[in-house]
Amino acid sequence: ISAHVGQTEFEAGVGGGQKMKAAGGKKALCVNHEVGNVALDRRCAGFKKGFGGSVDILGTSNDPTEIQKAVAAKLGGGYDTILTLGAGLSGEAALKALESAGKVGKVKLGTFDMSPDMLKAAAAGKVEFLIDQQQYLQGYLPVAIFAQYMRYGTMPAGVVMTGPGFVTPKNASSVIKWAAQGYR
């Protein structure tokens, strides 16, 4: 393999940790719905490095109801920051736990990836950020790179980063618009 187009999971986690630290986070929970999955483990490890403060890993199953209950059970533990590793699965479940406990806005929530409901939550200011791999670029750039390689023999070396990008309350509406048109 000459090049990788995408995001590297550890570095994306570092970026998420730095953003949460900058937002004032002191004690964080990284919700891992598939402990042992190297990519997800690296996301939490990167988050821990970027956050720099206290980070606990909450291992769960991939059952959204169980995730919601597990997060709810941890809310009394002084956590002011939660990062989940998948928007549609653990992100939505964590948001439901925060909503049920009346802690939206009091506990900062961020997640990897995007889902329609989490994009709406970001637009409403309920989520600090969604870490965006920019999947459109992950599909488009390899084709463009391969075409250049076939025509001219040129190929980038190493990783061509498409992420981490961050969808925040400030840009979520734009992302929703472009997603509806198939570009995000």
Name what the model sees in each region.
Residues H4-A28, P64-Q68, M114-M118, Q133-R151:
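Hydrophobic alpha-helical segments within soluble ligand-binding/sensing domains
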Residues V5-Q7, L29-V38, G59-S61, T84-L85:
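Short beta-strand->loop
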Residues A23-K27, G52-V55, G77-T81, V104-K108, ...:
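Loop/turn elements at helix/coil->beta-strand transitions in domains of secreted/extracellular proteins
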Residues F47, S61-A121:
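Hydrophobic alpha-helical
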Residues F51, L137-R184:
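Hinge/cleft segment of the Venus flytrap/periplasmic-binding protein
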